Each structure stands twice: as C-alpha cells, then as structure tokens.
C-alpha cells in the first residue's frame, strides 16, 4: 500500500508522544492499524499495546480492520516464502522477497520469536477497547468485581421513573426528562463538579440534588457502579495505589487513542497517568471535528497536549482522499473562521467536481419536497439509495423529511430515533382539546387539558369515566368563580368545533392561553419557551395540510405506523435505503451525495449557542456535515418557518456559498 509522507511519518513513529492531526478523509484508521503492524514488526510485545476508542462499535471495527490487514500480510509472507523455496530448488539467488517479514536479516531475539508466529496471532493479543471497557477491566482486576455489577441503562431509567412516580414532581415528557437527567449526572461526575455550586439545566436545584443523591444511594445499596464511576474509581485507584498504577504502566508500553478531540478531563487524567514514565502516547484526532462538548468533551485538551508532553512530535494528515476539490475548499473556508484551533493546510487528493449547490426555499415544505425529488432524480441517474444522505442539526427536524420520503415511496433508514411529532405531549394536549370540541367526553381527555392553562380544576371533580359539564358545575356549585371557568371552557370548545385544524390549534394557543402554560412549564424545566413553541408550530404547520380533524388524526396514525415499520426494518442493514441522520451521528461516515438541510440561524448555529465557544462548536458541527460528502454536496435553507421570516445561517456565507 502506498502512503504519503505524513502518513509514513506517523505510522513509523516508535517512542515518545506523538499527535496526529487527521483531517477529514485523510486515512487516519489506516495509519493507526499500520502503526500497530509496525510496532509488532519491531518486536513490541502485542499484549503491551493498548488501543482506545470512544465507542464499542469503533473498537470492534478497528480490531477487525487490523486483523484483516494482518491476515493479508501473513498471506503475502507465506507466498514470499514459497517463492523463495522454489528459487532455492532451482538454484536461484536470494532476492528481496526472501527477507524476513519482520525486518532485518538478524532481527534479534524478540524479533526472531515474532517471526515464528503469524501477525494475526500476535495481533489478537493487542488490547482494543473503549475507555469504559479498559477502565472496568482494571477495576475488575483490582476489586474482583462480580459480573453484572455495572448498572444498565434500563435500570437507571426505572429508578428515575420510580422516583418521579413517588414524588410531587410533575414533568410532561417523562422519557425526555429522564434522559436529560441521566446525561446531566454523567456530566457532573465526569467534570467532578461540586453539587453545592452546580446550577442544573433541567430542573430546580433542590430537585436535581434529590435525584442525584437518590441515584447515588441506589448504586451504593445495590453494590453497582455506572460508567462514570469507573472513571472516577480508576483515577482514585491510580492516585492512591502507586503499586497498582506501576503494574499497569509496565503492562501497557504503547497507548494509541483515536478521536482524541472527544476526550474529557477525567479520561485524559487517567490516560496521562497510565502513559508514564515513557509517555509512548500516540493520539489521533481533529480539533476541527470536536462536537461533543455537551457530553464533557474538551477540545482544549488536544490544543494543550504539546504543553503537557514536551517533545511531542506533531504530524498533519492533510490530504483529503474523500471529497472533491470544491467540497474541500468550501469546508475549509468555513472552519477557518474558528479562532481556537490548530492552523492546517488541507489539500484534496481528487480533482475538481461539480460546484457545491446552495439553494434557499420559501418554506420547509418546499425545501423537503425538492430534496425528495432530487433524491429520486439521483436514483434514476444510477445512484443507489444507500449512496445518498440527508443531514439535520437535530433529530426533531427530520420528521418532515421522513414524511416526504414516505409520500414519494423512497426507502430510508434512520441513524437516530426520529421523535414522533404526533406522540409528543403537546400534540396529545391539542388532540385532546379537539376531541372534546368534537364531542368526546372521555375523562382521559379532560385530565390532559383541565389545567393547561391552569383552571384550578381538581381531578376529584372528574369522578366518572364519562364527563358531564352539568355534573362538573354541580361539584363546584358553592364556588361561583369556578363555575365561571367551566362556562368559559364550554364556550371555547363551542368556538373551536367548526374550525379547521390549523385554526383550532391557533385558537387553543392564543385564545385559550395554552402558550402561557408552555411558558410556565418552560420556566420550571429551565428551558427556553421557544423550544416548546417550535413543537406547537410544527403541529400547526402539519394541521394546515388537512381540512378536518378526522383527516389530521388519521394521518398521524398512518405516520406512526410507518415509523414503526421503518424502525423494524433497521435490522436489515443490507437493504438499499437513503440515510437520514443528525450531523452528530453522521460523524465518521461518508456518502457520494449529501444534502445538508435547514441551514438557518437558530437551527445551525442552534438557538442555545450563545457563547463564542458554543458558536465555534456549532461551526465545527456544520464542518463535519459538509465533509461527509464525496462527490455532490447540496446545502439548503428556507426564507420562512412557521410563517415567520428566518435568516440563512451565517455559516453559509462563511463557506462562500
């Protein structure tokens, strides 16, 4: 295999710290696997090599790619040896093909030992794993942890669900809240923050502390740990037991870390301890692709690596073998607007292709229709569905595209779970209002809307499965002001009855005051009310396409069935389908044709991004999206969203589009 000079410098590096800055499509995985091969060829004990990645899938893929390389090398060696024997039998002279596979004619004791085994067999003893799996292995060895003592994700969710059921805390979207709390606790542990000074992003501090302390108590009483505890405990173990640290330092002489830009503080501290005293630490990453700050990733760690490890050799893998010249130049113009980064000169290996296409559409419906039509045109021109991807800033924005692809009968797969808009609690509230306006008297519908906005209704007032307004008034007969509220609700429902779905949604939000309820709930959850308004806006936009509530409700049911069908088909990995993905989930992937949609302010950069560091992270995320494309790149924005004007993302202009 041919390597460029930068790749050769990286894979031939032997001792001491090295930082490999790997631009998009620069062949970093190839460099890592070939460096492992070179270390083994040099006689390094395979059990002393540790390769760390961030996901189990990445670790598995890295190991498989290395073993595949090793098998190929073993086969080449075998063929060379057979050729040498034939040459000797026919009296031929020794040639370069006869040289020992692992290096010089006199490899030394360890090299001679290595020559006696296959590269694949040696490679099977190299350790590949995630931070969590490696640290758990260390803790299991030190503390004799029994199998199954790591708390599962489902066990976590069940604990928090039980807590909410038994507390006075009310949340609308239980699954979303629990997921947010789990991530927040992980962040607090990973950053080793003091709860006394921590300001929760999801709920009032007293509730977060109760959730955190209760979860911690569950772990203690059950004798379990979570992934974040592994990092903390491993750090404490190495700090307190220098003898144990020395044993692991002696074992792992060479440490390679992939995607180093995603490392967090605690992971870095443990790896630094483990790499001592030789500091044979080989890190590979791209600070321009650091997009997980919300999980605790700190790109500044990579930026400060050379200061922490004096004498570090740095090499830039600056040749992009993936994308056309136009795509490389467009993405580079964008990322150069970031101030806190390594300066890089990136060059395309490929020549010119088609210009990057940027278009602005009137509204999201027009945007998604055109993208769907373009996808079909690409397929008609000979592209496989699987060669095409549509990328979004968030999964919530992918629902409309999924609906359009269903309508055009275009097969697709989801790299993220698309939230079903119609199963959102706001949708359920709006549907309940409309059901009652249409004549439903089911108690479950009244339970949903009775205090949204707050009318001070008690659940005890709805004491029968079928609700009667007369009975409700009777319950409050000694409170005139409550009877007045009941009459107001009746009048609102009568006013809604003849309205088309979109008019009914707007009436509920403005005339009834549902938006006021959303504001108060957002304040409790430490959210921006705009996040909830956006969901209500999407529902209004959907409702506008239907003449009656019955039609809208039937559409929602069909959409839910289609989503279930798509999720079931996700197991069929070989099926030819268009990819719908968030920008985060697309990292590390590539497609001949890529559509980056919704390139508008408030979406990318996200409206939550306020600080300069947040904007730089959003720019890196957009950069990741652009650099997924091999041949054709389309970027799309809209002029208007939910009947309000919206600006094109600043990143579009920065990229020169």
What are these regions (language model features)?
Residues 391-450:
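Long, highly charged, low-complexity intrinsically disordered interaction regions
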Residues 402, 432-657:
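Conserved helicase C-terminal RecA-like lobe
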Residues 98, 153-223:
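Coupling/switch/interface segments within P-loop NTPase motor domains and analogous charged loops
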Residues 1-146, 246, 329-332, 627:
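P-loop NTPase Walker
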Residues 20, 24-32, 46, 310-313, ...:
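Helicase P-loop NTPase motor core
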